[in-house]
């Protein structure tokens, strides 16, 4: 393999039912930065059916070019179909970097593409950078159970691949001036129904009455220090008064105090709210990786040496079950 043959940064643009996923737009933001450092184009790779509007949305969010594989066989995700089409495109066009969202689709698709292309894949990255001189992707992720932060380099293989969870990076502002039909290339694909060994027989959407913590502007998060499921009710009251929602650390999830969809951290969700109130959370590295980019962090903990206190903009030393009721009273008084 000649590394010099590989040029360009690609983002797999994940769509479900004709709707682009947020993480793909976030990856365009980071991908644009990577592409500019390398002096190459940022290309969004879109697979689906009736892709015209989505293609324009990708351009308005930073893509220099869109490769659109538009076919009825690609309307819904299939491991075989998507992997084949993307691998064919990579072998033909030779990008040096390929980013994929770490969604349930991306976690299925990414390793299969990497295996077929005999290249490396760094999963669940929390940071991405470029060694411009060597054109190497520097992919950073927690390792050894979150006790270390490792930067992984795939220097001898191309394309370099990484998956990133939703919320790690920010979308670029919408720029409709970047939208142009000549930036959208509809690519021919070699795919037949027989290439797809698995079929989707039915899609059942589960309705959950739980807020998406990844979209919340205010989060009140509880950890082991909250003490009980009942004490979480006070956190819910505070969150409601502030127009936010509750979240939790892994310790609180494991004790089944709240739903697992509310977990923040390396094994949960990455969030970046305007306000993050950490209640009784010590701040293990896995948790910090999921919330440290919040605009303003308030930490409430009895232990002044807890790691969360060092990253907080405001650290309150005290019993969370005494401090939170006082905060509730103060907010109610201010609202009146």
UniProtKB/Swiss-Prot annotation:
GO terms for biological process: fatty acid beta-oxidation using acyl-CoA dehydrogenase. Binds 1 FAD per dimer. Disulfide bonds: none annotated. CDD domains: ETF_alpha. It holds the Pfam family ETF. The keyword Ion transport does not apply. It comes from the Bacteria. SUPFAM superfamilies: Adenine nucleotide alpha hydrolases-like (SSF52402), DHS-like NAD/FAD-binding domain (SSF52467). FAD binds at residues 275-303. SMART domains: ETF. Its cofactor is FAD. Keywords: Electron transport, FAD, Flavoprotein, Transport. GO terms for molecular function: electron transfer activity; flavin adenine dinucleotide binding. PANTHER family: ELECTRON TRANSFER FLAVOPROTEIN ALPHA, ELECTRON TRANSFER FLAVOPROTEIN SUBUNIT ALPHA, MITOCHONDRIAL. Heterodimer of an alpha and a beta subunit. Belongs to the ETF alpha-subunit/FixB family. The electron transfer flavoprotein serves as a specific electron acceptor for other dehydrogenases. It transfers the electrons to the main respiratory chain via ETF-ubiquinone oxidoreductase (ETF dehydrogenase). This is Electron transfer flavoprotein subunit alpha. The lineage of its organism: Bacteria, Bacillati, Bacillota, Clostridia, Eubacteriales.
């Amino acid at each position: 393999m000649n590394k010099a043959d590989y040029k360009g940064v690609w983002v797999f643009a994940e769509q479900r039912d004709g709707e682009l996923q947020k993480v793909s737009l976030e990856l365009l933001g980071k991908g644009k930065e990577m592409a500019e450092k390398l002096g190459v184009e940022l290309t969004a790779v879109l697979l689906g059916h009736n892709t015209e509007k989505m293609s324009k949305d990708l351009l308005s969010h930073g893509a220099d070019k869109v490769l659109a594989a538009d076919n009825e066989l690609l309307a819904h995700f299939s491991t075989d179909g998507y992997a084949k089409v993307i691998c064919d495109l990579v072998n033909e066009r030779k990008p040096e970097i390929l980013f994929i969202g770490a969604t349930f689709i991306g976690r299925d698709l990414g390793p299969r593409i990497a295996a077929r292309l005999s290249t490396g894949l760094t999963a669940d990255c929390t940071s991405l950078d470029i060694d411009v001189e060597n054109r190497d992707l520097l992919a950073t992720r927690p390792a050894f159970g979150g006790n270390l932060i490792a930067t992984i380099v795939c220097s001898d293989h191309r394309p370099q691949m990484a998956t990133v969870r939703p919320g790690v990076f920010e979308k670029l502002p919408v720029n409709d001036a970047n939208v142009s039909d000549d930036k959208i290339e509809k690519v021919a694909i070699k795919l037949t129904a027989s290439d797809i060994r698995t079929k989707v027989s039915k899609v059942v959407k589960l309705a959950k009455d739980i807020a998406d913590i990844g979209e919340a502007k205010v989060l009140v998060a509880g950890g082991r220090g909250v003490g009980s499921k009942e004490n979480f009710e006070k956190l819910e009251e505070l969150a409601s008064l502030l127009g936010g929602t509750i979240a939790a650390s892994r310790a609180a999830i494991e004790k089944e105090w709240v739903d697992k969809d509310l977990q923040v951290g390396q094994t949960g969700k990455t969030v970046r709210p305007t306000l993050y109130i950490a209640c009784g959370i010590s701040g293990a590295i896995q948790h910090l990786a999921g919330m440290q980019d919040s605009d303003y962090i308030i930490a409430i903990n009895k232990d002044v040496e807890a790691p969360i206190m060092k990253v907080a903009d405001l650290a309150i030393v005290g019993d969370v079950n005494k401090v939170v009721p006082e905060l509730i009273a103060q907010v109610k008084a201010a609202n009146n």
